[in-house]
A protein has these predicted regions:
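Sec-dependent N-terminal signal peptides of Gram-positive bacterial secreted proteins and lipoproteins
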Residues: 1-21
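Primarily extracytoplasmic ectodomains and periplasmic/lumenal surface modules that are beta-strand-rich
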Residues: 43, 99-101, 160-162
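Core segments of small alpha/beta cavity-forming domains
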Residues: 20-80
Length: 178
């Protein structure tokens, strides 16, 4: 599931980097970048749905994944701590506070190790569906948060600042999976 969410998040982040007409400062581009997620921009949600639809999950699991991601978008917070600008390049240090989905994933993995039979089907075989349902259930219960610091790189193109592609670690941090 972590891989699924990272892929979903990566696609959304790559397309969420577009700038607005007002991004004449790096700070404004960073705000635009994060606010697209908080506002659940139509493009972001459409791409989220398209990405989830292509995953090998039950319809119920797909719906719950989308809800988890939207919950993260609703609840994450960010603070721009510092911006260093040099010519047409900038680096923004941002502190993110996100729902700690990683804690639920770790608990699910521990449960699998301790009680593997819990995830067996009627024939005694491991059921990926049961495991994923349990993992999603645990992620839905998450209320604790975690804080990470990420470094965003930006480039100035035609007078407008644009956030560059995030690293996979930063993508995981943004989505509470790190």
């Amino acid at each position: 599931m972590k891989k699924v969410l990272v892929v979903i998040c990566a696609i959304l982040l790559f397309t969420g980097c577009s700038c607005s007409l007002n991004d004449t400062k790096p700070e404004e581009a960073v705000e635009t970048f994060f606010e697209k997620y908080r506002a659940k921009d139509d493009d972001i949600i459409t791409q989220l749905k398209d990405t989830i639809e292509n995953e090998d999950l039950t319809d119920d699991a797909k719906e719950k994944y989308q809800e988890l991601m939207e919950k993260q978008y609703d609840q994450f917070a960010y603070v721009i701590k510092d911006v260093k600008e040099e010519n047409d390049e900038a680096t923004a240090t941002v502190e993110l506070t996100v729902l700690n989905y990683k804690s639920a994933i770790l608990k699910t993995e521990e449960e699998l190790k301790a009680n593997p039979e819990k995830f067996n089907d009627e024939e005694g075989n491991f059921s990926e569906e049961k495991y994923m349902d349990y993992k999603i259930e645990k992620m839905q219960e998450v209320t604790d948060t975690t804080t990470h610091t990420i470094e965003l790189s930006l480039n100035k193109e035609n007078g407008m600042w644009k956030v560059n592609q995030l690293s996979s670690d930063d993508i995981s941090k943004l989505h509470g999976l790190y």
